[in-house]
Amino acid sequence: MELASPRLIRLDFEDLTAFERVNDQYRHMGIRFSGAIAIEPSNPGFRAKSGSTVLIPMGNLMSLSAYFDKPSCWAGAFVCSTRIVVLTAYDREGNFLGQTSTVANQPSLPDGQSESSPQQLELNRHGIAKVEFHSYVPFTLDDFFFALMP
C-alpha cells in the first residue's frame, strides 16, 4: 500500500494590491478567506515575514478566517502583534479541533513604540475545514501555509 503525501502550499500575498479585500483570490488553490484585507504596513513594528504585503482583519474586526475546499491536515501562518494572537481550527460541522496561540511580545523601543517579530502559529489536525486567527488588538498575517491530502 502506498501512502499519499500531502500537497504543501504557502501563500505570501505578494500578488495582492494594497487595500484589496481578500476572499476568493486563492480559490484555485482550494482556499478562501473571510474578513481579510491586504496591506503594506508602514509601521515597522508590524513588518512582514517575507515581502511587503500582509493580511489584516477588515474594519474593527479582530479576526480573520480561512476556509478549505478539501480538509487540511496542517495549517498556520506567521502573525505579528503586540498581544496574543490565537489560531483555532474547526471541522466541516464547526466542531472545535484545536487551538494554539502566540506569546505576548512587547519589547520597548527608545521612542516608546513597541515592535513585534513575526511568530509562527500552526496546528496539525486531521479534517481542518476552517481556521480562525483572533486577537484583541490589531495583528498582521503573512506566509499562510497549509497541507491538503490528494
Task: Tell me what each language-model feature is.
Residues 1-150:
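Surface-exposed, well-ordered secondary-structure segments
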